[in-house]
């Protein structure tokens, strides 16, 4: 998507609102899933999880080195990752989720959260959430949260809003459900509760 197209879509936000503009952009309805590695031969007694804010990938090489070298990450099965760029100048215009997954030997799912509108040199200006797994990802979807803050009116002008990635992993033949959620930091306590619980409640309702 060209910068001109991103700006044209952004200009619709004040009139239509974020969600109606997001409906016009196919990437918001998609969840990328890339299974890059085989499942581990041994099944651990306990799955080890960690939440990690990648901070856009502005220090991507250092982040990858840390993930590969830190002893505490050696046996991590699942990483719930926030704030990963795809095609933004500030992080080298690369696909941060793919670069991390390839470098640390994990599968990943990625969902679009924001399209950045500030820098015309961004190849895509995409910014989103990811879930990294040592186990195959059999299914994943993106759930967009109720709006708690309109980022189009911020100095970091954007299309989009906070989202969660729901996924099903194949852990040696056993299905394990996981969720990577990025909460809105520009809201109050009740707003945070809404964004934290909605994805699970919505999925439970869909399963009924």
Residue ranges and their predicted role:
Residues 84-85, 145-157, 180-189:
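Surface-exposed cleft-lining segments at the edges of enzyme active sites
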Residues 135-176:
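Active-site catalytic loop in hydrolytic enzyme cores
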Residues 1-106, 110-126, 192-195:
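N-terminal, active-site-proximal structural segment of metallo-dependent hydrolase catalytic domains
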């Amino acid at each position: 998507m060209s910068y001109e197209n991103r700006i044209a879509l952004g200009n619709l936000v004040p009139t239509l609102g974020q969600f109606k503009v997001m409906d016009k952009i196919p990437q918001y309805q998609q969840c990328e899933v890339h299974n890059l590695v085989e499942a581990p031969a041994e099944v651990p007694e306990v799955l080890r999880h960690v939440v990690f804010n990648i901070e856009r990938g502005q220090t991507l090489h250092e982040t990858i080195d840390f993930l590969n070298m830190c002893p505490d990450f050696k046996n991590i099965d699942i990483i719930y990752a926030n704030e990963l760029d795809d095609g933004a100048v500030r992080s080298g215009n690369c696909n941060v989720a793919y670069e991390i997954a390839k470098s640390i030997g994990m599968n990943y799912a990625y969902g679009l959260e924001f399209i950045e509108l500030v820098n015309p040199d961004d190849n895509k200006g995409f910014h989103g959430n990811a879930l990294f797994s040592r186990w195959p990802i059999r299914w994943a979807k993106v759930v967009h949260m109720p709006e708690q803050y309109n980022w189009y009116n911020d100095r970091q002008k954007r299309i989009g809003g906070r989202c969660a990635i729901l996924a099903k992993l194949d852990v040696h033949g056993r299905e394990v459900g996981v969720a990577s959620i990025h909460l809105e930091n520009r809201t109050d306590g009740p707003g945070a509760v809404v964004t934290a619980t909605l994805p699970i409640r919505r999925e439970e309702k869909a399963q009924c």
